[in-house]
Design a protein with these regions (language model features):
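Patatin-like phospholipase
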Residues: 1-37, 45-285
């Protein structure tokens, strides 16, 4: 049986999924395929490296630093989040908390990181084999929130956040041969996602990136469709949705350590359902 896990991201709400992954590492639970979208890309790569607690540190310590995100970055780099600081300065071999690149590559599990081509609006699925030591550009590209960040270039091609191209890539997991898939959401699964500021941000990138802007305008509908599809698969016993019943007040860019810690522990507790699911028990729909 081939198992997969999909982390849809969600900015700093991703600490919920970080709790799920730490539970899995504590219980020696591993997946044959890991797919990360946006902040989910950081979660899956640290999980493949076996670095328990690494994501927790990034969310609860580094994300609070002005170097990580803030108005100063917006003025200096035209991006609110400094992706080079997150996935370079902190994560490179000489950084404060280096990614164990060798462990990632030695892990037999497959990995896909989703980014969105800013020129075409299409999803690109970067594979683990495209990762190289101290060059974690796929994670930067996957996390480049439109308007909040400039698109990130990989091989001279600009990319935006993966959630524009494929917000809930559960179908991709099945297309890759998975039999059972854990879908990590960082919003309550029983609440449809609202439009938020998507239209506002889409208007800001429309002139230069019209296809990406169109994908941004339809992202909410496609996210809700992806969750509905995941629920259908859950009723069939092929998917387990792990999601918080409450986000503890944490939003995409919330800088509240106490709230993030609560959400992390909620994720850790909710992950207990994964053991039974992978053992063949059907998830409650």
């Amino acid at each position: 049986m081939k198992t997969g896990i999909v982390d849809v991201g969600g900015g700093l709400r991703g600490i919920y999924a970080a709790g799920v992954f730490d539970y899995c590492l504590d219980r020696d639970i591993h997946f044959d395929l890991s797919i990360g979208v946006s902040a989910g890309s950081a979660n899956v790569v640290s999980d493949l490296a076996g670095q328990r607690g690494r994501n927790y540190t990034f969310y609860t310590e580094y994300a609070l630093r002005k170097e990580y995100m803030g108005a100063r970055n917006l003025l200096a780099r035209r991006s609110y989040i400094d992706l080079d600081y997150v996935y370079g300065t902190l994560s490179n071999s000489g950084g404060e908390y280096p990614l164990d690149y060798q462990a990632v590559m030695e892990n037999p599990g497959e990995m896909l990181v989703v980014a969105t081509n800013a020129l075409t609006g299409s999803a690109r699925y970067f594979s683990k084999e495209e990762l190289s030591q101290d060059r974690y550009d796929m994670c930067k590209a996957s996390s480049a929130i439109p308007f909040v960040c400039q698109p990130y270039e990989v091989d001279w091609m600009p990319y935006f956040d993966g959630a524009l191209g494929d917000p809930v890539p559960v179908e991709k997991a099945f297309a890759c041969g998975c039999d059972r898939v854990v879908v990590l959401l960082t919003r309550p699964a029983d609440r449809e996602r609202g439009p938020g500021k998507d239209a506002f941000f889409a208007d800001r990138i429309q002139r230069k990136y019209p296809f990406a802007a169109q994908k941004l305008r339809t992202r909410v509908a496609r996210y809700n469709e992806g969750v509905a599809l995941s629920k259908k698969y859950q009723a069939e016993g092929r998917v387990l949705i792990v999601s918080p019943d409450d986000t503890c007040g944490v939003d995409t860019l919330t800088k509240d350590r106490a709230a993030m810690m609560r959400l992390y522990h909620k994720g850790y507790r909710d992950a207990e359902a994964i053991t039974a699911f992978l053992a063949g028990e059907r998830a409650a729909s």
